């Protein structure tokens, strides 16, 4: 089967949506012919994947939204469409295409709600929001990382009325690429790690709360590594400076795949302090757990289902620096608890999120 995968962002832009698109394409390519369509972005390098990626110049774009009118003609060559939602501007093109091509299969992956839009983004996304339910009605299936997230999302009502249309497929992680050090030498300095975008599109990651929590830690032998880049980095650097801990917070910038794997292995604790439902899952949690690192994440729908609170890590109240401080302290001042959670995290990553297990679930959806 020839499948057109459509996604609003794709590497080198960092983010979970693009990462999952690569994973899905690789999985589906074992049984199908897959082409990924995504908007042109500045400085996109040539890569091994590029022969399976078509970057289209949008007629209009704003943020991650883009109007790819060319798709309407290009989709004629494909038997099926895999649309990563949200994709304002292009989701409407898919909806319109399906009206005239009812036999073309459509599977949608619902990644996340979109909150905190600017006024212009709200105006530009209005057609997509208006046609959303019509588009979902056209879909053969709607996949998602967590049904818990869907049940508490902006499409909860649609899910309640069409539960059989939805299929939960958690994201996966390469447990050979992300794995613990064989002979780790413990350091007196406890390393806390955050990985994620530092741009306005990822405002919801809660880095400001993480910095505030770190400044209140009751012990001094810690270091915070922040891996990622974006237009908010200067703001976070200034916050760290204002809190008097510029020397204890390292902004590592955007790391390549090998550097990222190494930085996970060197961490004592991983933190994902997201503040709202723009965070739907957290692939970075899988990468950390596979690396044998205990995790702390916000008690948000979807995110809270990635691991078991008290086993592989701890959940926190969203946007609560004090609770985050207490949970960091609890793990990093108890070596036995840290070790126990690290081992459990690695075990869960292998048993539930290994690529082999997750890939089979995705292939089953397309077979059926």
Q: Which role does the model predict for each range below?
A:
Residues 133-177:
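A short, active-site helix/loop in glycosyltransferases that binds the activated sugar's phosphate group
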Residues 254-255, 262-267:
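Short alpha-helical donor nucleotide-sugar binding micro-motif in glycosyltransferases
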Residues 294-297:
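Short hydrophobic beta-strand element within catalytic cores of glycosyltransferases
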Residues 308-310, 314-322, 330-336:
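Conserved acidic donor-binding segment of nucleotide-sugar-dependent glycosyltransferases
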Residues 186-214, 225:
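Conserved donor-binding/catalytic core segment of Leloir-type glycosyltransferases
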Residues 105-107, 114-135, 151:
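Nucleotide-sugar donor phosphate/pyrophosphate-binding loop at the beta->alpha transition
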């Amino acid at each position: 089967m020839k499948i057109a995968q459509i996604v609003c962002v794709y590497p080198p832009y960092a983010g979970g949506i693009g990462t999952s698109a690569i994973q899905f394409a690789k999985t589906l390519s074992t049984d199908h012919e897959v082409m990924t369509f995504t908007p042109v972005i500045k400085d996109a390098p040539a890569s091994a994947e590029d022969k399976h990626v078509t970057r289209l110049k949008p007629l209009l774009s704003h943020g991650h939204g883009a109007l790819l009118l060319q798709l309407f003609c290009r989709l004629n060559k494909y038997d099926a469409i895999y649309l990563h939602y949200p994709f304002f501007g292009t989701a409407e093109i898919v909806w319109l295409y399906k009206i005239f091509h009812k036999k073309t299969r459509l599977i949608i992956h619902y990644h996340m709600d979109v909150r905190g839009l600017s006024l212009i983004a709200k105006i530009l996304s209005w057609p997509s929001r208006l046609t959303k339910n019509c588009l979902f009605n056209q879909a053969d299936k709607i996949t998602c990382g967590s049904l818990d997230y869907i049940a508490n999302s902006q499409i909860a009502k649609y899910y309640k009325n069409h539960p059989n249309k939805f299929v939960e497929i958690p994201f996966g992680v390469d447990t050979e690429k992300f794995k613990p050090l064989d002979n780790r030498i413990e350091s007196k300095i406890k390393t806390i790690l955050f990985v994620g975008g530092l741009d306005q599109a990822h405002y919801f990651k809660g880095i400001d709360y993480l910095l505030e929590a770190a400044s209140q830690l009751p012990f001094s032998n810690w270091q915070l590594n922040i891996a990622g880049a974006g237009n908010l980095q200067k703001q976070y650097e200034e916050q760290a400076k204002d809190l008097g801990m510029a020397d204890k917070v390292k902004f590592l910038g955007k790391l390549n795949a090998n550097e990222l794997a190494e930085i996970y292995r060197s961490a004592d604790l991983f933190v994902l302090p997201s503040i709202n439902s723009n965070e739907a899952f957290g692939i970075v949690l899988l990468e950390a757990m596979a690396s044998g690192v205990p995790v702390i994440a916000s008690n948000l729908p979807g995110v809270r289902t990635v691991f078991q609170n008290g086993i592989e890590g701890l959940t926190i109240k969203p946007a609560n620096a004090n609770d985050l401080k207490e949970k960091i302290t609890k793990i990093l001042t108890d070596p036995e608890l840290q070790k126990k959670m690290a081992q459990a995290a690695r075990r869960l990553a292998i048993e539930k999120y290994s690529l082999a297990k997750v890939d089979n679930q995705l292939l089953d959806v397309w077979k059926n």
